[in-house]
Amino acid sequence: MVADAQVSESKTAVRRGRLVVLAGPSAVGKSSVVRLLRERMPELVFSVSATTRDPRPGEVDGKDYRFTSRDEFQRMIESGELLEWAEIHGGLQLSGTPAAPVRRAIEQGKPVLVEVDLAGARAVRAAMPEALLVFMAPPSWDVLVERLTGRGTESAEVVERRLATARVELEAQDEFDEVIVNEDVSRSCDELVSLLVGRPEQSESTH
């Protein structure tokens, strides 16, 4: 019994958590899916991105995003605190992923979700090749345009920039390991849960 317990403890110690990187166009519904995912998977570690944009209604600093100034963001870049970072929508804002919480959670064997843009997904893949890249796509282009313009929270210029960015992102979805078409929030959430916990390491499952 003691030997079995020691073997089990050893396996737990060496198992690394799964890192899933989620990207997709603005207004594709990522936030709604992630919100439901966090309710269904309380053990999930969700990487809180640092961003220089202003909070949207209902967003909480430190929970939804780490809202920061450009000066503070620049300091984080220079001190190597970010796993990835990028200029978003033609330089309107800066966004990045603090590295320490992600690496710590993976070493502890926890499932980790990082939500980034296309450039961020590429950067995480370069830094952590074991990451599983997941692209969330809209049912159609028309649906995406309707969702984005229906927000009513951004100027026409910002909307046009977001649409231009979305075209580039949609053209790059073949770079991702998995594609989820977000027609239904609950179903998309189920697919993410499966990707986060449904593929145990073969080396461990066969022993």
Curated annotation (Swiss-Prot):
GO cellular component terms, A-Z: cytosol
Principal EC category: transferase
Every Guanylate kinase-like domain range: 17-197
SMART domains: GuKc (SM00072)
UniProt entry tagged with the keyword Transmembrane: no
Residues that hold ATP according to the record: G24, P25, S26, A27, V28, G29, K30, S31
Family as reported in the entry's similarity comment: Belongs to the guanylate kinase family.
Protein name: Guanylate kinase
Protein source organism: Rhodococcus jostii (strain RHA1)
Lineage of the organism: Bacteria, Bacillati, Actinomycetota, Actinomycetes, Mycobacteriales
